[in-house]
UniProtKB/Swiss-Prot annotation:
Cellular localization per UniProt: Mitochondrion inner membrane
InterPro entries associated with the record: Cyt_b/b6_C, Cyt_b/b6_C_sf, Cyt_b/b6_N, Cytb/b6-like_sf, Cytochrome_b, Cytochrome_b_C_euk/bac, Cytochrome_b_N_euk/bac, Di-haem_cyt_TM
TM helices/strands, residue ranges: 33-53, 77-98, 113-133, 178-198, 226-246, 288-308, 320-340, 347-367
Residues annotated for heme b b566 binding in this entry: H97, H196
UniProtKB keywords: Electron transport, Heme, Iron, Membrane, Metal-binding, Mitochondrion, Mitochondrion inner membrane, Respiratory chain, Transmembrane, Transmembrane helix, Transport, Ubiquinone
Residues that bind a ubiquinone: H201
UniProt protein name: Cytochrome b
Molecular function GO labels: metal ion binding; ubiquinol-cytochrome-c reductase activity
Gene, per the UniProt record: MT-CYB
GO cellular component, one term: respiratory chain complex III
Further details from the record: Heme 1 (or BL or b562) is low-potential and absorbs at about 562 nm, and heme 2 (or BH or b566) is high-potential and absorbs at about 566 nm.
Main location: mitochondrion
Membrane topology: Multi-pass membrane protein
Family that this chain belongs to: Belongs to the cytochrome b family.
Length: 379
């Protein structure tokens, strides 16, 4: 008799995605981050659901409701810090996942890659709106500064900002709608993840060599299920260590002060995972130019497949491209550092040089060095 997992209409979809899925035999730990992102999303949705049961999205009570969750709700502090630091783990896994895609040429699966970029934007929007909800100083001023950027859009900008705010400043209406969207977006993200996987399973996984692996496939279960579970354990250990030992390590102390529209914090900055984009935004002394650079810093990923000039897919056997890739990583780390610094010499010029380098590496140096490598290999 055929196994029920192969015949049942629902189970056979799960079976072909997670059990009998043919996978390349050479996948390294860099392929663990997709499943880790799935776990992060599940943790965020679950903790977020329980937080939403106690949170109130009203300017008068939002800050106090978060304090109430931490002090009075059973294990509320665990929920709150799991959710806050879970977002950090989410972005660590996201950036490593995208980096893996860039290094090993996974972007040549263009549909999967483009859905991934949409997912990245959706997760960033979700995280931004979530940061506003505790209604601390940095929540309020972060929301004010970032939404205000839309006023740089010609003609409709000002109207658009007031429409998003629901008034003439960030206030009760803004907080309520941000809560509504923050609740809704993760479910849209979940749907997009399914589309992402659908497109991935049309082509099958890439592998570290970038060479087609059709002749040498192994079943996903038990090989990669066990490997993924090890990844889960390592990530959840790291997350619980962060939550239980230094839950505020990645947060901003200003957010423990209730939002006050009459007093601006000395340094307005977003959460650490947006600092690289914030540094690029600040490096251009023009509002519209800065906003365009900010959007393009992520959207540039969409042109990477078009600029692939190498005859090889992966960077595994391309040392010159590897050097450029790690230079790009160094530039991004520099931008992250600069985003958290005040706008003064020498940070301004360092940020501007790093921003220019970021775009140059992706748009010009990578394609050129690939052409050189083809020539050196007589291809």
């Amino acid at each position: 008799m055929t196994n029920i997992r192969k015949t049942h209409p629902l189970l056979k979809i799960v079976n072909s995605s997670f059990v009998d899925l043919p996978a390349p035999s050479s996948l390294s730990s860099w392929w663990n981050f997709g499943s880790l992102l799935g776990v992060c999303l599940a943790v965020q949705i679950l903790t977020g659901l329980f937080l939403a049961m106690h949170y109130t999205s009203d300017t008068a009570t939002a800050f106090n409701s978060v304090a109430h969750i931490c002090r009075d709700v059973n294990y509320g502090w665990v929920l709150r810090y799991l959710h806050a630091n879970g977002a950090s783990m989410f972005f660590i896994c996201l950036y490593l996942h995208v980096g893996r895609g860039l290094y090993y040429g996974s972007y040549l699966f263009t549909e999967t890659w483009n859905i991934g970029i949409i997912l990245l934007f959706a997760v960033m929007a979700t995280a931004f709106m979530g940061y506003v909800l505790p209604w601390g100083q940095m929540s309020f001023w972060g929301a004010t500064v970032i939404t205000n950027l839309l006023s740089a859009i010609p003609y409709i900008g000002t109207d658009l900002v007031q429409w998003i705010w629901g008034g003439f400043s960030v206030d009760k209406a803004t907080l309520t709608r941000f809560f509504a969207f923050h609740f809704l977006l993760p479910f849209i993200v979940t749907a997009l993840v399914m589309v992402h996987l659908l497109f991935l399973h049309e082509t099958g996984s890439n592998n570290p060599t970038g060479i087609p692996s059709d002749p040498d496939m192994i079943p996903f279960h038990p090989y990669y299920t066990i490997k993924d579970i090890l990844g889960f354990l390592i990530m959840l250990t790291a997350l619980s260590t962060l939550v239980l030992f230094s839950p505020d390590l990645l947060g901003d102390p200003d957010n423990y002060m209730p939002a006050n529209p009459l007093s601006t914090p000395p340094h307005i900055k977003p959460e650490w995972y947006f600092l690289f984009a914030y540094a690029i935004l600040r490096s251009i002394p023009n509002k519209l130019g800065g906003v365009l650079a900010l959007v393009l810093s992520i959207l540039i990923l969409a042109v990477v497949p078009l600029l692939h000039t190498s005859k090889q897919r992966s960077m595994m056997f391309r040392p010159l491209s590897q050097c450029l890739f790690w230079l790009l990583v160094a530039v991004l780390l520099t931008l992250t550092w600069i985003g958290g610094q005040p706008v003064e010499h020498p940070y301004v010029i360092i940020g501007q040089v790093a921003s220019v380098l970021y775009f140059l590496i992706l748009l010009i140096f990578m394609p050129l060095i690939s052409i050189l490598e083809n020539y050196l290999l007589k291809w």
